[in-house]
Amino acid sequence: MTLSTLILTLSAFRVIFQTMKTTNHPAEEHSYHHGNLFSALLDSAEQELIERGIEGFSLRGVAKRVNVSHAAPAHHFGDANGLLTALAARGFERFIQRQRDFRRRAPADPRAQLEASGVGYVVFALENPAIFRLMFSSDRPDFNDSNLQQVAESAFEGLVKHVRAVTEDKSSPKQDSAMMLDVAAAWAAAHGLADLLVAGRLDELRSIAPRTRDRRIAAIIGRAISFLPNRR
Protein backbone atom coordinates (compact mmCIF):
# COMPACT_ATOMS: atom_id res chain seq x y z
CA MET A 1 0.00 0.00 0.00
CA THR A 2 1.44 3.35 -1.02
CA LEU A 3 1.57 6.27 1.37
CA SER A 4 -1.08 8.17 -0.60
CA THR A 5 -3.42 5.15 -0.52
CA LEU A 6 -2.90 4.79 3.22
CA ILE A 7 -3.72 8.48 3.75
CA LEU A 8 -6.91 8.15 1.68
CA THR A 9 -7.93 5.02 3.60
CA LEU A 10 -7.37 6.73 6.96
CA SER A 11 -9.34 9.75 5.74
CA ALA A 12 -12.23 7.50 4.75
CA PHE A 13 -12.24 5.83 8.16
CA ARG A 14 -12.20 9.27 9.79
CA VAL A 15 -15.27 10.32 7.80
CA ILE A 16 -17.08 7.09 8.72
CA PHE A 17 -16.14 7.52 12.38
CA GLN A 18 -17.35 11.13 12.43
CA THR A 19 -20.61 10.07 10.78
CA MET A 20 -21.11 7.39 13.43
CA LYS A 21 -20.47 9.94 16.18
CA THR A 22 -22.98 12.33 14.67
CA THR A 23 -25.56 9.58 14.27
CA ASN A 24 -25.17 8.40 17.85
CA HIS A 25 -24.99 11.84 19.36
CA PRO A 26 -28.03 12.78 21.44
CA ALA A 27 -30.71 14.01 19.10
CA GLU A 28 -31.58 16.88 21.36
CA GLU A 29 -28.40 18.70 20.30
CA HIS A 30 -29.38 18.51 16.66
CA SER A 31 -33.16 18.44 16.43
CA TYR A 32 -34.43 20.56 19.29
CA HIS A 33 -34.12 24.04 20.59
CA HIS A 34 -33.86 23.96 24.40
CA GLY A 35 -37.44 25.14 24.93
CA ASN A 36 -38.81 22.85 22.22
CA LEU A 37 -37.16 19.83 23.83
CA PHE A 38 -38.69 20.73 27.19
CA SER A 39 -42.17 20.80 25.62
CA ALA A 40 -41.52 17.65 23.59
CA LEU A 41 -40.48 15.79 26.73
CA LEU A 42 -43.65 16.89 28.53
CA ASP A 43 -45.79 15.80 25.57
CA SER A 44 -44.06 12.42 25.49
CA ALA A 45 -44.32 12.10 29.27
CA GLU A 46 -48.07 12.57 29.01
CA GLN A 47 -48.30 9.85 26.36
CA GLU A 48 -46.11 7.57 28.48
CA LEU A 49 -48.39 8.17 31.46
CA ILE A 50 -51.54 7.48 29.43
CA GLU A 51 -50.20 4.26 27.93
CA ARG A 52 -48.14 2.84 30.80
CA GLY A 53 -49.66 4.38 33.91
CA ILE A 54 -47.85 5.68 36.97
CA GLU A 55 -46.29 2.32 37.79
CA GLY A 56 -44.85 1.83 34.31
CA PHE A 57 -43.70 5.43 33.86
CA SER A 58 -39.96 5.88 33.28
CA LEU A 59 -37.51 8.49 32.02
CA ARG A 60 -36.11 5.96 29.55
CA GLY A 61 -39.56 5.39 28.10
CA VAL A 62 -40.08 9.13 27.68
CA ALA A 63 -36.64 9.61 26.11
CA LYS A 64 -37.27 6.77 23.67
CA ARG A 65 -40.48 8.41 22.47
CA VAL A 66 -38.62 11.65 21.69
CA ASN A 67 -35.60 9.79 20.27
CA VAL A 68 -33.13 11.39 22.66
CA SER A 69 -30.70 9.97 25.18
CA HIS A 70 -32.15 8.99 28.55
CA ALA A 71 -29.95 11.72 30.06
CA ALA A 72 -32.03 14.41 28.33
CA PRO A 73 -35.12 14.22 30.56
CA ALA A 74 -32.87 13.80 33.61
CA HIS A 75 -31.06 17.01 32.66
CA HIS A 76 -34.33 18.96 32.51
CA PHE A 77 -36.31 17.34 35.32
CA GLY A 78 -33.88 15.45 37.56
CA ASP A 79 -35.79 12.18 37.89
CA ALA A 80 -39.13 10.60 37.04
CA ASN A 81 -40.88 12.32 39.93
CA GLY A 82 -39.50 15.66 38.76
CA LEU A 83 -40.93 15.07 35.30
CA LEU A 84 -44.28 14.01 36.78
CA THR A 85 -44.24 17.17 38.91
CA ALA A 86 -43.80 19.33 35.81
CA LEU A 87 -46.51 17.33 34.04
CA ALA A 88 -48.92 17.87 36.95
CA ALA A 89 -48.16 21.61 36.90
CA ARG A 90 -48.98 21.77 33.20
CA GLY A 91 -52.12 19.79 33.96
CA PHE A 92 -53.26 22.40 36.48
CA GLU A 93 -52.67 25.16 33.93
CA ARG A 94 -54.91 23.37 31.43
CA PHE A 95 -57.41 22.59 34.19
CA ILE A 96 -57.72 26.30 35.02
CA GLN A 97 -58.04 27.18 31.33
CA ARG A 98 -60.77 24.58 30.76
CA GLN A 99 -62.86 26.06 33.56
CA ARG A 100 -62.27 29.53 32.12
CA ASP A 101 -63.49 28.31 28.71
CA PHE A 102 -66.80 27.20 30.20
CA ARG A 103 -67.23 30.38 32.23
CA ARG A 104 -66.81 32.50 29.10
CA ARG A 105 -69.85 30.81 27.58
CA ALA A 106 -71.97 31.15 30.72
CA PRO A 107 -74.10 34.06 31.97
CA ALA A 108 -72.35 36.56 34.23
CA ASP A 109 -74.52 35.64 37.21
CA PRO A 110 -72.23 34.37 40.04
CA ARG A 111 -74.10 31.09 40.46
CA ALA A 112 -73.98 30.41 36.72
CA GLN A 113 -70.24 31.16 36.76
CA LEU A 114 -69.67 28.72 39.63
CA GLU A 115 -71.73 26.06 37.88
CA ALA A 116 -69.75 26.59 34.66
CA SER A 117 -66.49 26.20 36.57
CA GLY A 118 -67.80 22.90 37.93
CA VAL A 119 -68.65 21.70 34.43
CA GLY A 120 -65.16 22.66 33.23
CA TYR A 121 -63.70 20.76 36.18
CA VAL A 122 -65.58 17.58 35.30
CA VAL A 123 -65.04 17.83 31.54
CA PHE A 124 -61.30 18.31 32.05
CA ALA A 125 -61.23 15.08 34.07
CA LEU A 126 -63.12 13.23 31.34
CA GLU A 127 -60.81 14.54 28.63
CA ASN A 128 -57.60 13.94 30.62
CA PRO A 129 -58.16 11.04 33.05
CA ALA A 130 -54.49 10.11 33.44
CA ILE A 131 -53.45 13.71 34.13
CA PHE A 132 -56.41 14.21 36.46
CA ARG A 133 -55.40 11.18 38.52
CA LEU A 134 -51.80 12.41 38.58
CA MET A 135 -52.92 15.82 39.85
CA PHE A 136 -55.28 14.58 42.55
CA SER A 137 -54.63 10.91 43.35
CA SER A 138 -50.89 10.37 43.17
CA ASP A 139 -48.07 10.97 45.65
CA ARG A 140 -45.46 11.15 42.88
CA PRO A 141 -45.63 14.90 42.13
CA ASP A 142 -43.78 17.13 44.59
CA PHE A 143 -46.32 19.67 45.80
CA ASN A 144 -43.52 21.58 47.51
CA ASP A 145 -42.25 22.46 44.04
CA SER A 146 -42.81 26.20 43.65
CA ASN A 147 -44.30 26.04 40.16
CA LEU A 148 -46.71 23.21 40.96
CA GLN A 149 -47.63 24.80 44.25
CA GLN A 150 -48.39 28.10 42.53
CA VAL A 151 -50.72 26.70 39.86
CA ALA A 152 -52.46 24.33 42.30
CA GLU A 153 -53.10 27.22 44.68
CA SER A 154 -54.33 29.34 41.79
CA ALA A 155 -56.87 26.64 40.90
CA PHE A 156 -58.08 26.49 44.50
CA GLU A 157 -58.24 30.28 44.81
CA GLY A 158 -60.43 30.35 41.71
CA LEU A 159 -62.89 28.02 43.41
CA VAL A 160 -62.90 30.14 46.57
CA LYS A 161 -63.48 33.29 44.51
CA HIS A 162 -66.52 31.87 42.73
CA VAL A 163 -68.06 30.36 45.86
CA ARG A 164 -67.54 33.66 47.66
CA ALA A 165 -69.24 35.54 44.82
CA VAL A 166 -72.34 33.37 45.31
CA THR A 167 -72.57 33.26 49.07
CA GLU A 168 -70.89 36.21 50.72
CA ASP A 169 -72.69 39.39 51.69
CA LYS A 170 -70.09 42.13 51.22
CA SER A 171 -71.64 44.16 54.01
CA SER A 172 -71.19 41.23 56.39
CA PRO A 173 -68.34 38.97 55.21
CA LYS A 174 -68.44 35.35 56.27
CA GLN A 175 -65.95 33.97 58.75
CA ASP A 176 -63.24 31.91 57.08
CA SER A 177 -64.48 28.71 58.71
CA ALA A 178 -68.00 29.15 57.32
CA MET A 179 -66.68 30.10 53.89
CA MET A 180 -64.42 27.05 53.78
CA LEU A 181 -67.37 24.78 54.53
CA ASP A 182 -69.13 26.20 51.46
CA VAL A 183 -65.95 25.82 49.39
CA ALA A 184 -65.39 22.24 50.53
CA ALA A 185 -68.98 21.30 49.72
CA ALA A 186 -68.82 22.82 46.22
CA TRP A 187 -65.44 21.20 45.60
CA ALA A 188 -66.71 17.81 46.76
CA ALA A 189 -69.64 18.06 44.35
CA ALA A 190 -67.47 18.73 41.28
CA HIS A 191 -64.62 16.43 42.26
CA GLY A 192 -66.91 13.60 43.31
CA LEU A 193 -68.69 13.64 39.95
CA ALA A 194 -65.38 13.87 38.08
CA ASP A 195 -63.93 10.97 40.05
CA LEU A 196 -66.98 8.78 39.42
CA LEU A 197 -66.78 9.42 35.68
CA VAL A 198 -63.03 8.82 35.49
CA ALA A 199 -63.55 5.55 37.38
CA GLY A 200 -66.00 4.42 34.70
CA ARG A 201 -69.19 4.96 36.68
CA LEU A 202 -72.29 6.79 35.38
CA ASP A 203 -71.83 5.29 31.92
CA GLU A 204 -74.92 7.06 30.59
CA LEU A 205 -73.01 10.35 30.86
CA ARG A 206 -69.93 8.94 29.17
CA SER A 207 -71.77 7.55 26.16
CA ILE A 208 -73.77 10.57 24.98
CA ALA A 209 -72.84 13.49 22.72
CA PRO A 210 -70.54 16.02 24.42
CA ARG A 211 -73.02 18.91 24.24
CA THR A 212 -75.79 16.85 25.83
CA ARG A 213 -73.33 15.45 28.36
CA ASP A 214 -72.20 18.93 29.35
CA ARG A 215 -75.80 20.07 29.88
CA ARG A 216 -76.44 17.11 32.14
CA ILE A 217 -73.25 17.70 34.06
CA ALA A 218 -74.34 21.32 34.50
CA ALA A 219 -77.70 20.14 35.84
CA ILE A 220 -75.99 17.82 38.34
CA ILE A 221 -73.55 20.51 39.46
CA GLY A 222 -76.38 23.04 39.70
CA ARG A 223 -78.41 20.74 41.89
CA ALA A 224 -75.39 19.90 44.04
CA ILE A 225 -74.60 23.57 44.74
CA SER A 226 -78.21 24.63 45.16
CA PHE A 227 -77.75 24.50 48.94
CA LEU A 228 -75.38 27.48 48.77
CA PRO A 229 -77.20 30.59 50.01
CA ASN A 230 -77.39 33.53 47.64
CA ARG A 231 -75.76 36.77 48.70
CA ARG A 232 -78.11 39.06 50.56
Regions found by a protein language model. Give the residues of each.
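Amphipathic alpha-helical segments used for helix-helix packing
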Residues: 126-143, 195-203
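Short hydrophobic clusters on alpha-helical segments that form packing/core surfaces
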Residues: 41-49, 91, 95, 121
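Amphipathic C-terminal alpha-helical segment
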Residues: 165, 186-205, 223-232
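Amphipathic alpha-helical packing segments from all-alpha helical-bundle domains
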Residues: 100, 143-169, 180-184, 211-227
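N-terminal intrinsically disordered/low-complexity leader segments
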Residues: 1-36, 228-232
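Helix-turn-helix
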Residues: 40, 44, 51-82, 86
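Alpha-helical DNA-contacting segments of helix-turn-helix folds
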Residues: 49, 84-91, 135, 151
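Hydrophobic alpha-helical connector segments
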Residues: 86, 100-131, 152-156, 172-176, ...
